[in-house]
């Protein structure tokens, strides 16, 4: 149990730190669509796709790795609450086009990158 807690704790801290760095670095480029949040969610979509395949195929991996990557790191990195407030801020300010654009970018982008991550992992594992 101790190692599970440590895996989640360390993963979450690293994921949250990366999300913060992405926001600091990218949000200033295009304020209408906070690119840091988008990048975190898209990267998280790709990594969860890879992880879903790897942890399904490589059943011998210690369970702490799954906790570290999926529960910890991706839990700290991705952010549905920030995405939600960014979409609703646009909507409440009457910027419905921006609200829909931000929502569509996050959802379609994340689904597409999750599929790409799964494809990447399957190709990588088949070649190994």
Curated annotation (Swiss-Prot):
Protein's job: Fluoride-specific ion channel. Important for reducing fluoride concentration in the cell, thus reducing its toxicity.
Binding residues for Na(+): 75, 78
InterPro entries: FluC
UniProt similarity note: Belongs to the fluoride channel Fluc/FEX (TC 1.A.43) family.
Domain of life: Bacteria
Family matches, as PANTHER family: FLUORIDE EXPORT PROTEIN 1-RELATED
Activity regulation annotation text: Na(+) is not transported, but it plays an essential structural role and its presence is essential for fluoride channel function.
Protein name: Fluoride-specific ion channel FluC
Membrane topology according to the record: Multi-pass membrane protein
């Amino acid at each position: 149990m101790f190692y599970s807690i440590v895996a989640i704790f360390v993963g979450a801290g690293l994921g949250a730190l990366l999300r913060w760095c992405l926001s600091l670095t990218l949000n200033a480029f295009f304020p209408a669509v906070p690119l840091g949040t988008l990048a975190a969610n898209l990267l998280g979509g790709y990594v969860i796709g890879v992880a879903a395949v790897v942890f399904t195929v490589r059943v011998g991996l210690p369970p702490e790795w799954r906790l570290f990557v999926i529960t910890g790191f991706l839990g700290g990195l991705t952010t549905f609450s920030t995405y939600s407030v960014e979409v609703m801020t646009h909507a409440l300010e009457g910027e419905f086009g921006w609200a829909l654009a931000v929502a569509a970018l996050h959802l379609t982008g994340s689904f597409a990158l999750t599929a790409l991550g799964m494809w990447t992992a399957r190709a990588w594992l088949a070649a190994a």
